A protein has these predicted regions:
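A helix-coil-helix interface module used to build multimeric assemblies
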Residues: 1-198, 204-219, 280-281, 291-295, ...
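Active/binding-pocket-proximal capping segment
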Residues: 271, 394-401
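Long, amphipathic alpha-helical stalk/connector segments used for oligomerization, subunit docking
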Residues: 302-388, 394
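A short, charged helix-loop
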Residues: 217-233
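A conserved active-site cap/scaffold subdomain adjacent to cofactor or substrate pockets
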Residues: 234-269, 278-339
Length: 476
């Protein structure tokens, strides 16, 4: 029996690792790590805190007494003070020095920063694995000619692998963005109620050097390079917007990829994985719907819209802080991460099992290639003594006739036959067939793929080689 609502991001889409990042255990054990780091740093800077007190805090770092905290919060209506109380129940010797000099945002904001960095690192790992799978795909099909499309109308041929580099290029931009944001994240530190560190001035008898050192010591203990040099009670909520923008960027890239896959699947050129017993439609048993791509698109829409939340929060903060950020942050930030986690799992799953139908691709290409070969045909006819302007007009007329045969009469493209039968060109059918080699029209597609993989992708994969080899498990 399931009586209450469950978030689909948790039960259907996100992986276990990301759910652990945003779990209550991770959040509140990080609060306790921060209290330990604060106590250790204050002791090292001369405050009267004992090794015994710190040892007691460490002993209970991970066994969170949620029942005590929950009961206390019903009384005091304050989550941080409820957990200070609960920790003190477990650590009676250290109770008096927990949270010394700090305000709620010391644990709340610093923990948010730590957890967001953990989430970004997991997203980065999955992103790199998607890039790696796309690289294999691009290399495999780097020389396979296919119709390109502009305005979803047939255009000069490209290769299947070259098209995949376009998907990768957007992910490379996302990779660069996520690396920058991860590297630029700092802790809030220990700034006090309005960011002035006034409480620590009292604790350390006005010793500015010790107070500055306290911030850096906490950052070091928590694995950060430093803290933001100035703040109000909270870190600037623009940081949250920067983080969600990275996630929205990945969502945009993934959505674009699925647009192409869905259109290619309609053309029967490329197909996402379809399992042996998978059902496409409850009514139409023959259906092979691109449901993975559609799910990515759906989740991506959510993430892109979710990125508005931290923008609104940051823009409506007052002075040193207001609390109208809190409820929104608790929802929008975890859900953005959970959704992107699901997107990347699906992306990896699709690329790993994507099917390419080479004969269908060739058939579609050859149906359009006579039109695309006309410039070369015209040049060859000029070499045989023809007039360029006259040939151009004749090709225009014959192309319109061939187009009518295809669209109105349902016939094959007979443009080459029409040209061969026209005395204006002085070209035989055999000479015209020489213009029908698709590789003549793909330009540097193959070489561009090789250069891109060697110069852009391989260095990224080499830098992240320890993170490679992931597989994606799709729940439904």
């Amino acid at each position: 029996m399931k009586e209450f609502y469950e978030n689909p991001l948790c039960v259907r889409y996100s992986g276990d690792a990301m759910k652990r990042v945003f779990s209550a255990d991770n959040k509140f054990s990080t609060w306790r790590k921060l209290w330990i780091a604060l106590a250790e740093s204050e002791k090292e800077l001369g405050l009267n805190i004992t090794d015994e007190q710190i040892a007691e805090l460490k002993e209970h770092q991970n066994d969170i007494n949620y029942d005590v905290a929950k009961a206390r919060e019903k009384e005091v209506r304050h989550d941080v003070m409820s957990h200070v109380y609960a920790y003190g129940v477990q650590c009676p010797k250290a109770k008096g020095i927990i949270h010394l000099g700090a305000t709620s945002c010391y644990v709340g904001d610093n923990t948010d920063m730590i957890i967001m960095r953990e989430g970004l690192q997991l997203v980065k790992k999955k992103l790199v694995n998607v890039i790696a799978e796309l690289a294999k795909f691009a290399d495999r099909y780097k020389a396979l000619p296919t119709l390109a499309f502009t305005h979803f109308q047939p255009a000069q041929p490209t290769t299947v692998g070259k098209r995949a580099t376009l998907w990768m290029m957007e992910l490379v931009q996302d990779y660069e963005d996520i690396c920058y944001v991860i590297d630029s994240l700092k802790l809030l530190g220990s700034k006090g109620t309005t960011g002035t560190q006034a409480s620590f001035m009292e604790l350390f008898d006005g010793d500015h050097a010790k107070i500055r050192k306290l911030d850096q010591m906490i950052a070091d203990k928590m694995g950060f390079a430093g803290v933001y040099p100035v703040s109000g009670q909270t870190y600037s909520r623009k940081v949250d917007s920067r983080v969600l923008n990275v996630l929205a960027g990945i969502a945009m890239s993934a959505h674009k990829f699925t647009n192409d896959v869905r259109l290619l699947q309609h053309l029967k050129e490329v197909e996402e994985p379809f399992e042996k017993h998978q059902i496409g439609s409850s009514a139409m048993a023959y259906k092979r719907n691109p449901m993975r791509s559609e799910r990515i698109a759906s989740l991506a829409d959510y993430v892109i819209s979710d990125a508005m939340n931290p923008m609104l929060v940051a823009s409506t903060q007052w002075f040193e802080r207001t609390l109208d950020d809190s409820a929104n942050k608790r929802i929008s930030i975890p859900e953005g991460f959970l959704a992107v986690d699901g997107i990347l799992d699906l992306y990896l799953n699709i690329v790993d099992g994507m099917v390419v139908y080479e004969k269908v691709i060739h058939k579609h290409l050859m149906a359009e290639l006579p039109f695309m070969a006309t410039e070369n045909i015209m040049m060859d006819a000029v070499k045989e003594g023809g007039d360029r302007q006259e040939l151009h007009e004749k090709i225009r007329q014959l192309s319109m006739e061939a187009g009518r045969n295809v669209k109105v009469n349902g016939l094959d493209n007979n443009l080459l036959d029409l040209i061969a039968a026209d005395d204006t060109f002085h070209l035989t059918k055999e000479q015209l067939q020489q213009c029908m080699n698709p590789e003549r029209y793909t330009g540097r597609s193959k070489e561009q793929v090789e250069d891109f993989l060697a110069e852009v992708i391989n260095p990224i994969l080499a830098k992240n080689k320890e993170d490679l080899g992931m597989t994606a498990e799709i729940n439904v």
